[in-house]
Regions:
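Glycine-rich beta-strand-to-loop/alpha-helix junction loops that act as flexible
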Residues: 9-11, 62, 67-75, 163-164, ...
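Structural signal for hydrophobic packing residues in well-ordered secondary-structure cores
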Residues: 34, 58-61, 87, 91, ...
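Proline/glycine-rich low-complexity loops and linkers
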Residues: 42, 49, 77-184
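Glycine-rich phosphate/diphosphate-binding loop of Rossmann-like nucleotide-binding domains
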Residues: 1-45, 250-254
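Flexible, glycine/charged-enriched surface loops at secondary-structure junctions
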Residues: 40, 113-115, 186-194, 216-226, ...
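An accessory alpha-helical subdomain
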Residues: 158-261
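Eukaryotic N-terminal low-complexity, Ser/Thr- and Lys/Arg-rich leader segments
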Residues: 1, 268-299
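N-terminal small/polar loop signature for handling phosphorylated ligands or for N-terminal nucleophile
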Residues: 24-96, 103-106
Length: 299
């Protein structure tokens, strides 16, 4: 399994001003290809915090670390300095990064924009870093490789640094980060079924979840209590299976759903709604999501 960690930088994330939708978005994209962020660390705009946070994540030897935030021109944008400090590298002018910034100004009708120190700051990268194009924004993303050890094994962690502006982060992630992670993971298929249950408590199906996980240890099975509605308990139940074979993924997820359908019925509950995602055959051109119950025919 490919391992991914994330370091999110910004005081605004820690004081309640900004919700960390960036990490949520990246996590969802990765989960969709069968990979999961195993750790998210959020730190304030401080060289020491950024540096120590990155070192903490690197110590675990992940395949990728995605650093988000702090690449802009303002004084509190110090992520790249913090990353360089952690890696023992200098921060230096990067000609390719400067070219990307100038090209952005030309592309947006600001060809004569003077390159002030604040703007040149966005082109100062840790030595050995590669700038990544930022189509909608100014500050380039950054890619670098970090050698390490995990036990007796030599490892290489790819560190990506992305801007915190959501639409810029998404653009760079989609064009540069996601494809590289996908090459590392190989093609995986994700099958997901979500059941909306009525008439059973979360504690009622807890033993069933434990039993299902023993039978399907690689599956993700998670319950979410939704409170009482008209005096009856409501629970949402997620079931996710990831496999290299689409049919195997579909079949295992369907088997888990059948198991819970039987247990819920036996407990006096019922399925209000069932949604499948990623469970169409490859040749199907219709939507990948439907709401038919387990075992029913689907067009």
């Amino acid at each position: 399994m490919v391992s991914v960690s994330s370091l999110c930088v910004g005081k605004e994330l820690l004081i309640g001003k900004t919700t960390n939708t960036n990490a949520t978005w990246v996590g969802a994209r990765l989960f969709g290809i069968g990979t999961m962020i195993d750790r998210i660390l959020t730190v304030t705009d401080s060289l020491d915090e950024i540096s120590s946070g990155l070192l903490e994540l690197l110590e675990r030897g992940p395949d990728f670390v995605i650093v988000i935030g702090g690449l802009g021109p303002t004084p509190d944008d110090m992520t790249l300095k913090g990353v360089a400090l952690a890696l023992g590298r200098r921060v230096e002018p990067n000609a390719a990064a400067l070219r990307l910034i100038k090209e952005h100004y030309v592309r947006t009708g600001r060809a004569g924009m003077p390159m002030t120190p604040a703007r040149r700051k966005m082109a100062r990268l840790p030595e050995g870093a590669t700038p990544l194009p930022n189509e909608p924004g100014t500050a380039p993303g950054v890619r670098m490789e970090v050698a390490g050890e995990k036990g007796k094994k030599t490892t290489t962690t790819v560190v990506f640094c992305l801007p915190g502006v959501p639409h810029e982060m998404k653009a760079i992630y989609s064009s540069s980060v996601h494809p590289e992670i996908l090459r590392k993971t190989g093609r995986l298929y994700t099958s997901k079924i979500v059941m909306q249950l009525e008439g059973v408590f979360e504690s009622t199906i807890t033993p069933d979840i434990a039993e299902a996980l023993r039978e399907h240890p690689s599956a993700y099975i998670k319950s979410h209590p939704k409170g009482l509605k008209k005096g009856r308990s409501n629970v949402e139940l997620d079931m996710v299976v990831v496999a290299k074979d689409r049919d195997a993924s579909n079949a295992e997820c369907a088997a888990i759903a059948e198991f819970f359908a039987e247990r819920v019925a036996a407990a006096g509950g019922k399925i209000l709604k069932l949604t499948r995602t990623g469970m169409r055959p490859p040749s199907s051109s219709s939507s990948s999501s439907d709401t038919s119950p387990p075992g029913s025919a689907r067009s």
